[in-house]
């Protein structure tokens, strides 16, 4: 399948993509509130769900929807997804969309995978629930823990603690680290350092760790024990003539200065995503993790790798730690662990931390932390089957095979006059929209450029993530080459339509 946007690119390979600004067809579908609403984090502009007299509309529904503005629930019908099949989802009216975000970075094996469905139904028929408290547990939870430990090869890990989500995993990390330092007689070593623009979840603690203002505003966050250091976004934050390595050195120096300012005896841990996800898909600059890890080791500060998005093949490696030679003390995983078919998350705990936790719990009589659904047998059974599929179908090799075309196909649009940067690796990509191709020249917030682009994608049958004037792609890992081409085509057509709309807005502004 060759769409017009690709034909134009190929026929004008010697010219800049910024010259390709004419829309292939008239577009009259613009966000209903694009001139009124500010650029929004996390929610795609639901501009296509306009007021309707259809009986199956759900405007004013009874759900307090996550990461959704109140006016969206009140004034617009939501996009109601009814079923999924492979890399596609279908709405309640039967419209087909290629799911270019894999739900929320999570349905790595696509929709309607029969082996995962069978694993769930078999376990439901055998043992639908039992807990893991008080030295009681289930066989699926024991088997999954062993499987995860065997798959993680960046360093040896000791134990697995099960949660229901990535947010719960990162929230639990803080309790584990505090418990650990209390056991070692270090009651003041409690502060956490995270990074600006990071995302670690939306509970009180995990939202505090996150470095996105939208998660803090009017929630009285972040918590006082959380500090934030530099975002490692080279394109946006490097100094003139500063190389990536020099940028990484400066950020490591800034981290060390923050540690010294606060007192190394007060800093417990540093948490980082191997590739930042919801903050805009930000891969680290060269030598970044090497230099950061050296600082942490110098001051006896634990490293937590948040692999909720990057684990199980997203980057073309089984874990993000493998890609960047990260040697963490603790790891958070979720999402692709079960391909999102069942809620489950987990923490990988190093042997050193495990030994201290065991010693402390022996003194106290219990390790008093856990959840009703920790190690839920159905979730664990599905996750076990998902991990088998990753290995049996060589999903990592498949990602490595299709990722180059995915990356080069989207990055071919980097010359667009409204694109500042397209960045990513493996099967994850982010696009940042700016004026004059400068990180210091944003579009007016009221234009909602990211939302305009998201609406154009949705109109063409593709779902993406919008975060202000950043958009993200993170499709299922099972994509076929034809599906990769479909995403590239729809991205290109949506981009041209957005360019045309921005030209109109500029003309009106004068």
UniProtKB/Swiss-Prot annotation:
Enzyme Commission number(s) from the entry: 2.6.1.96
Q: Which reaction does it catalyse?
A: 4-aminobutanoate + pyruvate = succinate semialdehyde + L-alanine; 4-aminobutanoate + glyoxylate = succinate semialdehyde + glycine
Q: What is its main location?
A: mitochondrion
Give the subcellular location: Mitochondrion
Domain of life here?
Answer: Eukaryota
InterPro entries xref list: Aminotrans_3, Aminotrans_3_PPA_site, PyrdxlP-dep_Trfase, PyrdxlP-dep_Trfase_major, PyrdxlP-dep_Trfase_small
* N6-(pyridoxal phosphate)lysine PTM sites in chain numbering: 335
Broad EC category: transferase
Q: Where is the transit peptide?
A: 1-41
Report the GO molecular function annotations: 4-aminobutyrate:pyruvate transaminase activity; adenosylmethionine-8-amino-7-oxononanoate transaminase activity; pyridoxal phosphate binding
Q: Where does pyridoxal 5'-phosphate bind?
A: 166-167, 306
**CDD domains membership:** OAT_like (cd00610)
State the UniProt keywords alphabetically. Answer: Aminotransferase, Mitochondrion, Pyridoxal phosphate, Transferase, Transit peptide
Any single Gene Ontology cellular-component annotation: mitochondrion
- List, in alphabetical order, the GO biological process terms annotated in this UniProt record: biotin biosynthetic process; gamma-aminobutyric acid metabolic process
Sites where the protein binds substrate: 199, 335
Q: What does this protein do?
A: Transaminase that degrades gamma-amino butyric acid (GABA).
Which NCBIfam families does the UniProt record give? PRK06105.1
* Protein name, as recorded: Probable gamma-aminobutyrate transaminase 3, mitochondrial
Species of the source: Oryza sativa subsp. japonica
Lineage, opening ranks: Eukaryota, Viridiplantae, Streptophyta, Embryophyta, Tracheophyta
């Amino acid at each position: 399948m060759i769409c017009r946007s690709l034909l134009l690119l190929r026929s004008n390979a010697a010219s800049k993509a910024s010259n390709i600004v004419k829309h292939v067809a008239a577009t009259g579908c613009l966000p209903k509130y694009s001139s009124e609403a500010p650029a929004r984090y996390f929610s795609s502009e639901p501009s296509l769900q306009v007021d309707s007299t259809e009986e199956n509309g759900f405007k004013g529904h009874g759900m307090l929807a996550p990461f959704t503005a109140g006016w969206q629930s009140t004034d617009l019908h939501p996009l109601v997804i009814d079923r999924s099949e492979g890399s596609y989802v279908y709405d309640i009216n039967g419209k087909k969309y290629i799911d270019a975000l894999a739900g929320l970075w999570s349905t790595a094996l696509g929709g309607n995978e029969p082996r995962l469905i069978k694993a769930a139904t078999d376990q439901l028929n055998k043992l639908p629930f039992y807990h893991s408290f008080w030295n009681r547990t289930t066989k699926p939870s024991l088997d999954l823990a062993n499987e995860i430990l065997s798959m993680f090869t960046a360093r040896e890990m000791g134990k697995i603690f099960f949660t229901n989500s990535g947010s719960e995993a990162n929230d639990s990390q803080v309790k584990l680290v505090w418990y650990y330092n209390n056991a070692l007689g270090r009651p003041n070593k409690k502060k956490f350092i995270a990074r600006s623009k990071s995302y670690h979840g939306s509970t009180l603690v995990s939202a505090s760790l996150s470095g996105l203002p939208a998660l803090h505003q009017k929630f009285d966050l972040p918590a006082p024990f959380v500090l934030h250091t530099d975002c490692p976004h080279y394109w946006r934050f490097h100094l003139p003539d500063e190389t990536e390595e020099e940028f990484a050195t400066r950020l490591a120096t800034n981290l060390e200065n923050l540690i010294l300012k606060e007192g190394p005896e007060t800093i417990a841990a540093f948490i980082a995503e191997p590739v930042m996800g919801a903050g805009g898909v930000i891969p680290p600059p060269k030598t970044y993790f090497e230099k950061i890890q050296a600082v942490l080791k110098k001051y006896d500060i634990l490293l937590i790798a948040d692999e909720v998005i990057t684990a199980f093949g997203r980057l073309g490696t089984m874990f993000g730690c493998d890609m960047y030679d990260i040697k963490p003390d603790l790891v958070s995983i979720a999402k692709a662990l079960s391909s999102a078919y069942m809620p489950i998350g987990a923490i990988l705990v190093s042997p050193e931390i495990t030994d201290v936790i065991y010693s402390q719990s022996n003194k106290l009589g219990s390790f008093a932390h856990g959840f009703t659904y920790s190690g839920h047998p159905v979730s664990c059974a599905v996750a076990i089957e998902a991990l088998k599929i990753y290995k049996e179908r060589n999903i990592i090799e498949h990602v490595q095979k299709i990722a180059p075309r995915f990356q080069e196909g989207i990055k071919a649009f980097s010359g667009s006059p409204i694109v500042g940067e397209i960045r990513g690796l493996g099967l994850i990509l982010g696009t940042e929209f700016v004026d004059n191709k400068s990180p210091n020249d944003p579009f007016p917030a009221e234009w909602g450029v990211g939302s305009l682009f998201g609406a154009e994608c949705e109109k063409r049958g593709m779902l993406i993530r919008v975060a202000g004037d950043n958009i993200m792609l993170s499709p299922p890992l099972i994509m076929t080459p034809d599906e990769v081409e479909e995403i590239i085509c729809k991205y290109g057509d949506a981009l041209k339509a957005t360019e045309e709309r921005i030209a109109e807005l500029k003309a009106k502004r004068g």
